[in-house]
Amino acid sequence: MSRVKRGNVARKRRKKVLKLAKGFRGSHSRLFRTANQQVMKALRNAYRDRRKRKRDFRRLWITRINAAARQQGISYSQLTGQLKKANILLNRKMLAQLAVLDPVAFAKVVETAKG
């Protein structure tokens, strides 16, 4: 049986983890064992929060549309139903942008939906 030398592989793996941990505080960026734990935790959080961001933005858009719609005397749920009936195909992101940046145009969209 020949001898297997793995020093380079281990060093490369540890350097990769420490490179990912750059910017972490204290031993979390210097010691391999703690850095490895923190990198795994950071990657897990990043994976989870990439999905959470989509939910958060959708909630923000709905809140903004609801606030702007109530100023026009209609609730969010009524507005979405009437938009569907009027065959106005604006998604929540577009409606929220209109509500924030161009309230006059949003008011016209609401009036059109009310029909």
From Swiss-Prot:
Keywords tagged on the record: Ribonucleoprotein, Ribosomal protein, RNA-binding, rRNA-binding
Annotated Gene Ontology cellular component terms: ribonucleoprotein complex; ribosome
Gene Ontology BP terms: ribosomal large subunit assembly; translation
CDD domains: Ribosomal_L20
Molecular-function GO term, any one: structural constituent of ribosome
Top-rank lineage group of the source organism: Bacteria
Described purpose of this protein according to its UniProt entry: Binds directly to 23S ribosomal RNA and is necessary for the in vitro assembly process of the 50S ribosomal subunit. It is not involved in the protein synthesizing functions of that subunit.
Family: Belongs to the bacterial ribosomal protein bL20 family.
Name of the protein described by the UniProt record: Large ribosomal subunit protein bL20
